[in-house]
Amino acid sequence: MAGGRDMNQATAIAMATPSLEDAQRSRLLFCLFCACTVAYVLMRHANSLLLDPDSWWQVKVGLDFLANRTFPTVDPYSYTFAGQPWIAKEWLGQVLLALAYDAGGWNGVVTLIIATIGLTVFLMGWFLSAWLKPVLAVVLAFVAAFLVAPIYTARPHVFTLPIIVIWTAMLFRAAQEERAPSPWLLALVVLWANLHATFTLSFVIGGLAGLYLLSRTGLSKPVLLAKWVAFGLLCPVVSLVHPYGVKAILATLTVAYGNEAVPLILEWRPFNAQEELVKEAVMLLALFGLLVSRLRIGWAKALFIVFTLHAYLSHQRFMYLFFLLVPLAIMAEVAQQYPALSAATWLAQKRDGLEKVLARHYYAISGAVAVLLIGAVSVLGSVQQIAPSPKTSASGALAFARDQRLSGNVLNSYNFGGTLIFHGIKTYIDGRTDQLFLDGFTKTDDATGHSDGKPLLEARLKKYAIGWALLAAGDTRIPFFEELGWKRAYADEYAVIYLPGA
């Protein structure tokens, strides 16, 4: 396909369209509207962003860093693995959460998360509308945002969503236009590496984009290929610009290969079609569309789709790789092979009434949106006080423990580890199982809740000199505590406290 045709269609049509500026303004406002709609929906369900028990300790790690200005190298938060090697590899994301918490409590944390998700949706719409009609682009962006909603939690991975969208869109665009990737993209790798451990995905996505270039040019442009190879080699190098250096990469590998906790954590479990009917329907519909349409994407992009689908089917947490990135990767082919859907066709048409209004009042609308956003944040902070779910906070139980001056080591349910860390109580187990609670510890802890787990539980109570137990109301070990003579000292809808019998 000729190089001119392969150019970004919005750029190609610019030379011939007098109303390009108005069209681009309309395009921008369409994307802004989509982002604001998603942000509004999230604000209406803000408490759902704080359902993850790990939000507690992620914020606490950031707060401790701001207070001490030191990067931890050993575990300071549990008694079972105290002093064992542990690094805050996602320190920058944790600091951002802590700064938001300092500024506005949990309301501030939620506001920051919603703003980041809104930015992600805006970028999705913007990159898609470079090739597709804006209305189609924002609909796709909105649908993608809805499908990946389960990953919207107050944790550092959310801060990487705008980065992975930019990274994927820019690299595949560079390959499409047969040019070298911009060096400034390497700065995104540095930022990504300090925000969250998924930065190693940048290496894979970059490699697949490079294969796409190779599928287009073959070996006919050796200088260009050399630039791509150099860029790819620099990605892991610049990721070492991190307080922990290569340890951050090694810590990522411990999760990916052989971590005993992975099968026990919901987000790491494989895709389950019986529980994800909507997502299954979307994937089957997409597969059906590829099979019956005339869309040709080439082997490199097919490999990219296979990679993202494999990651999602293997671990539910990677759903965003498929639903966010696949549209970005194949949008050029859709626009080229179905011109009626393309941005080029839209740009060549006369602007309709709505588009003219948007373009004519661009600055007024943008200003109004800014005022509304500021007002919404103010209302969110003053009217609705957001707090983590009682299912993870154990607020009543911890108040009882504080009033009764309970002391000694606590045996806690997994989901209460975060709130214990936040409140300065050393944990038995918590959500940092990517680096800690290994060597059989997590497996044994899980086994204590099985039907034959009472002897294992009794052994652990003695081994770790447990002074009290903080358990979720549905913890399967509760009958064992009663059989072992422990007394229920506190109970509510969400948590139970047991103390040793006389």
Residue ranges and their predicted role:
Residues L66-F71, A197-L295, F323, A329:
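Transmembrane catalytic cores of multi-pass membrane glycosyltransferases
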